[in-house]
Amino acid sequence: MEPLQITEEIQNWMHKAFQMAQDALNNGEVPVGCLMVYGNQVVGKGRNEVNETKNATQHAEMVAIDQVLDWCEMNSKKSTDVFENIVLYVTVEPCIMCAGALRLLKIPLVVYGCRNERFGGCGSVLNVSGDDIPDTGTKFKCIGGYQAEKAIELLKTFYKQENPNAPKSKVRKKE
């Protein structure tokens, strides 16, 4: 991970990603939000939708990828060309699954807020973004640390509350 040089552009896009994360929190989701920017235009945005959809793969990045594919179709753009020129702005380091998808799509740059110490795919757990992994797409650059404290506070807020979508405990009490 490279150190972050904060620019007005990064501040603008990350502010919008944090709005998506707040929306996720307001809707009972893990507060992660992201934007996929192509040619200074948002072509995909997402927030976690795992609980809403009952689909564990509906992370913010996956939702945004689907939107980019739709945008490409509506604008007669070749998705491979678009993905190769996208910058992803996301509030939390992409998980291993999402980092794998980003690598396969050849997204060149990811800017993120806080590290994902449990599932991070940009170096916190595995370095999917930068390791030599045969036949798995292209390495991509990760720049982290933008308002990491803010991202962590959003996550703490989520994990302090009751999750009505969590499965019931199957632990039996001894009698």
Curated annotation (Swiss-Prot):
The record's Pfam families line, in alphabetical order, gives:
MafB19-deam
Name the InterPro entries for this protein: APOBEC/CMP_deaminase_Zn-bd, CMP_dCMP_dom, Cytidine_deaminase-like, tRNA_aden_deaminase
Q: Which UniProt keywords apply?
A: Hydrolase, Metal-binding, tRNA processing, Zinc
Cofactors per UniProt? Zn(2+)
Q: Which reaction does it catalyse?
A: adenosine(34) in tRNA + H2O + H(+) = inosine(34) in tRNA + NH4(+)
PANTHER family for the chain:
CYTOSINE DEAMINASE FAMILY MEMBER (PTHR11079), TRNA-SPECIFIC ADENOSINE DEAMINASE 2 (PTHR11079:SF149)
Q: What does this protein do?
A: Probably participates in deamination of adenosine-34 to inosine in many tRNAs.
Q: What is this protein called?
A: tRNA-specific adenosine deaminase 2
